Amino acid sequence: MARLEVDILTLFPRMCAGYLGESILGKAQEAGLLAATITDIRDHATGKHRVCDDAPYGGGAGMVMKPEPLVEAIEAARARLPGAWVVLTSPRGARLDQALARRFAEHGRLILACGRYEGVDERVMTAVDMQVSIGDFVLTGGELAALCVVDAAARLVPGVLGNAASADAESFAGAEGLLEYPQYTRPPEFRGMRVPEVLLSGDHRRIERWRRREALRATRERRPDLFTRVSLPESDLRLIDAGDDEL
């Protein structure tokens, strides 16, 4: 049975515990499809106060995470999870996308090291396999990014989602990476806004064509950078501008 094993190394364990215990991730752990451990980096610090940060050499604002506690936490995690990839959450990292999330899910073992303060001592990089970012912005720490990695990867593990087709139909899924089509549920009319007729028709072929058209339109309008990378057949180029009566 495939499953995802993760160990999150953090200075603030409670920030991660709540999220991992709820909703799909909580159920995945109960089902044995996700094994999530949270390690307090301070457990690997020395001294009475277990200090994990210090002033940067060369001067400058803020504090830098010391190498000893984090590297020792990584080494201990590697011993628990042989073969795991060590991933440091960092604005300098590769952008997390669906393809990378799938690689993480398929690999099955991750050690996620969360940065804090002004950054991490560069010597820690000798113990890291890769750095990952969730966008071109700066957060207070790497915990939110680590949780994004776990969430994105775990939902791709077979059995985690109730309907296996859910992951395949979502935005960025599949080789094309299109955005998802719009979703509707009851009631059929809300404040004068009606659900598209085609979704109520029961005609599965028309529904699939409508969903395909709307995914193409959404990607073209909202993420032209993605749209220009997709090689579309002539049928899709015709479909994207087709009216509902042409579906």
UniProtKB/Swiss-Prot annotation:
Keyword tRNA processing: yes
Residues noted as binding S-adenosyl-L-methionine in the record, renumbered to the chain: G115, I134, G135, D136, F137, V138, L139
A single GO BP: tRNA N1-guanine methylation
Primary residence: cytoplasm
Tagged with keyword tRNA processing: yes
Entry keyword set: Cytoplasm, Methyltransferase, S-adenosyl-L-methionine, Transferase, tRNA processing
GO molecular function, one term: tRNA (guanine(37)-N1)-methyltransferase activity
SUPFAM superfamilies given in the database record: alpha/beta knot (SSF75217)
Superkingdom, natural source: Bacteria
Cellular component terms per the entry's GO annotation: cytosol
Catalytic reaction annotation: guanosine(37) in tRNA + S-adenosyl-L-methionine = N(1)-methylguanosine(37) in tRNA + S-adenosyl-L-homocysteine + H(+)
Compartments in which it is found: Cytoplasm
Enzyme Commission identifier(s): 2.1.1.228
Disulfide bond entries: none
Alphabetical list of InterPro entries matching this protein: Alpha/beta_knot_MTases (IPR029028), tRNA_m1G_MeTrfase_C_sf (IPR023148), tRNA_m1G_MeTrfase_TrmD (IPR002649), tRNA_m1G_MTases_N (IPR029026), tRNA_MeTrfase_TRMD/TRM10 (IPR016009)
Residues passing through the membrane, by range: none
Enzyme class of the recorded protein, top EC level: transferase
Sequence similarity: Belongs to the RNA methyltransferase TrmD family.
HAMAP family per record: TrmD
Functional description taken from the UniProt entry: Specifically methylates guanosine-37 in various tRNAs.
Subunit structure: Homodimer.
Record-given protein name: tRNA (guanine-N(1)-)-methyltransferase
Organism of origin: Anaeromyxobacter dehalogenans (strain 2CP-C)
Classification of source organism: Bacteria, Pseudomonadati, Myxococcota, Myxococcia, Myxococcales
Gene: trmD
